[in-house]
């Protein structure tokens, strides 16, 4: 699988003339890139409108990721991934549906971003695991917050009701001053709010044991859980399911965040300075608060 690359238009407003076709291509590809586009903020908002991601009122998150902070915050492991395959903000009641990512700066160290279509993996599920997944609720730990996992498990219990969880001293990438997060258990399989496609909505460890912690709590902790997570990790490890993109400065990526999980890995030695910065703009389901 490959990330689909679109031609960089001299006048990005031309996209609005064939927005219906572009949206169809996007929902088929799930991840598209405009290489070294040089698009400014106004032009990125034209992309948003052309692909139907939302409006000014729907823009819910706008933030930067400094990869140096992330790299230094994670202990060196026996593998090349600096974070496991994950879905964005999977603990929220309304997780992000669409996103525009722009690599605003890029240093000497090489790296790649990886993507996997979780809707495609749902279609590959064996019948017994598909039945299990469609009837199971899970709770994702709020990403980037240092959490007492044993206490978190006790708070979750076996209820699928939402709850508030206190957080202290957010890790790099967190939100300073935030005292708690609202956590929502959700079905393991959900329908995409735009396309209606069924999607496996989970975060998992890859390789197994990454961080030494499990980032997902299954409310159905039967033997089927082990069968399901074993199958899922095997599929996530399969290169045939992975799409990889070598980042460069000025690259703009449009991503179906509801359907696609992602990861990051380094190819070369890490840099001496924090020069690799990714600007994120995420949109939720229209009307979701």
What are these regions (language model features)?
Residues 254-256:
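Short beta-strand segments
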